[in-house]
Amino acid sequence: MGLKVNVSAIFMAVLLTLQTPTGQIHWGNLSKIGVVGIGSASYKVMTRSSHQSLVIKLMPNITLLNNCTRVEIAEYRRLLRTVLEPIRDALNAMTQNIRPVQSVASSRRHKRFAGVVLAGAALGVATAAQITAGIALHQSMLNSQAIDNLRASLETTNQAIEAIRQAGQEMILAVQGVQDYINNELIPSMNQLSCDLIGQKLGLKLLRYYTEILSLFGPSLRDPISAEISIQALSYALGGDINKVLEKLGYSGGDLLGILESRGIKARITHVDTESYFIVLSIAYPTLSEIKGVIVHRLEGVSYNIGSQEWYTTVPKYVATQGYLISNFDESSCTFMPEGTVCSQNALYPMSPLLQECLRGSTKSCARTLVSGSFGNRFILSQGNLIANCASILCKCYTTGTIINQDPDKILTYIAADHCPVVEVNGVTIQVGSRRYPDAVYLHRIDLGPPISLERLDVGTNLGNAIAKLEDAKELLESSDQILRSMKGLSSTSIVYILIAVCLGGLIGIPALICCCRGRCNKKGEQVGMSRPGLKPDLTGTSKSYVRSL
């Protein structure tokens, strides 16, 4: 009974093993051809951004300092106009060519808002990015009544960060970089300092703030419509107090670092006021959505030797797995962190079936190419083991001082603590751990993939040869087509005449051939009869040598 139970248990274990999915990356087989994984992370995508307005007030409230700072304020206003007027003119030129599109309802005959349209004829030349930014600019613009209310509110406040709620609008933040200095230092010291000294201090502070604003909005002077401002540059102009601004915006969470590193928070200028000297920006701060089940893997390759030739396996730098599916991964729009991978857009795209077979462990499906020039990786540390191409670089056991040789029938050398605890490879000393990879991988036990060329000259040469062969094949096909067309051009009557002529020739030629054969046979019979003598000579008493000569 116990034997039956054990047999059943073994059978079930084998069955479960056979049903285990094999769609993930086969790191064991890939390591045999020098491909290892150096990290995996979750996959997060930025979703639709939330927009909120931010007002930067460039002119501080100096009601109590008017008598001492008139000259400095006049000079500061002149500098601000040189910065703000070009931006204002560009914004006006774009927004004047964008008007709302209104549709008329068929039932009630009244207009309703349908969207915006860009007057391209009046605008002239504009790039696609400028047109898209212009539409977004129109959609985020404040109306004239809101601008007037905002101007009145800013003229009465003297707080560095003031939250102002507009009717029908989102929360607006008014930020002024010099107001704290005026409130906390200049006004309390009015009785101790002279009027000239107060004016000089305020002038220096305003000049410094002007320099910061100029560095912040420098790209906007060249392209105020589509140039975007990162939150890092905005934090510099706000005195580095980015936490207070983000707190007022209502943004928090563990993904803040990922958004900042991926430059996900953007700000675009939507309004410039040259009367009260303030700028309105539309800030877009996205939220992150983690795609469940998707894991992003980073791959690295090590070159290996086959005889005197050095090869490496051609695999993508990043791939993604989701269940059985393996996909390519475009890392151009992504930021990689220990917490995960953050991308501004979807980075997954399909992978060829042959490359999927390669990553699943079929080494014969992995293409390889010759190493040209200096190749980056001839050794790599993975899971505490050193995978090195000791046929191309010097590998030395630092513990014993001996050279680690790589046999010609091995393509790579796997060094662990049981072989050498401390290894010196290419001048770098590395302490390795316990063995995680096999001691050696022999060439005759691996099915290598097809060799390919990635060099531009070689690819061009191969492509030229392929084109030449295609042209030759095309000429042969054209000649065969001509023969077929000539055969098709013959009429059925002509074909019948040709067959009749062939038959008549055969009827005449066959009897003549038979007669010729009979005549030759008769002549041969006559010649044989003439060559036979009637009497044989008497050879009695003749020597043997004479007989042999006969």
Swiss-Prot record:
This protein's name: Fusion glycoprotein F0
Disulfide bond sites: C334-C343, C358-C366, C390-C395, C397-C420
Consequence of changing T461W: Hyperfusogenic
Pfam families xref list: Fusion_gly
Effect of L354M: Hyperfusogenic
Localization per Swiss-Prot or TrEMBL: Virion membrane; Host cell membrane
Interaction with hemagglutinin, as annotated region: 367-444
Coiled-coil features, chain-numbered ranges: 138-166, 462-487
InterPro entries: Fusion_F0_Paramyxovir
Region (Fusion peptide): 113-138
Family, similarity comment: Belongs to the paramyxoviruses fusion glycoprotein family.
Gene Ontology CC annotations of this record: host cell plasma membrane; membrane; viral envelope; virion membrane
